[in-house]
Regions:
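Ribonuclease/tRNase effector modules and their secretory precursors
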Residues: 1-83
């Protein structure tokens, strides 16, 4: 389990071919910004290998981001939306 208080992502991955973020009018850049704000992380109940991050973009937009944590702190963003 990651220590979320000291978590610093090494890199980000995203499937631009499926682009589930755009369906919610969220850009990949906005999703990444949320990882560098004050954030809260919970386990995703539906998928045990995924997490939910609630954070803010530089512009102040509050988003929920669904992601997987891969080896070496690589974050695979699945989707996200406004909350």
């Amino acid at each position: 389990m990651a220590n979320w208080n000291r978590f610093l992502p090494k890199d980000f991955e995203y499937d631009f071919d499926q682009d589930k973020l755009s369906a919610h009018r969220v850009s990949f850049e906005e999703a990444v910004e949320c990882f560098f704000s004050d954030f809260e992380i919970r386990r995703n109940k539906a998928y045990k290998d995924r997490y939910q991050l609630i954070g803010k973009t530089i512009g102040g937009r509050k988003l929920k981001i669904i992601f997987q944590l891969k080896p070496d702190n690589v974050v695979r963003i699945i989707t996200g939306w406004d909350i």
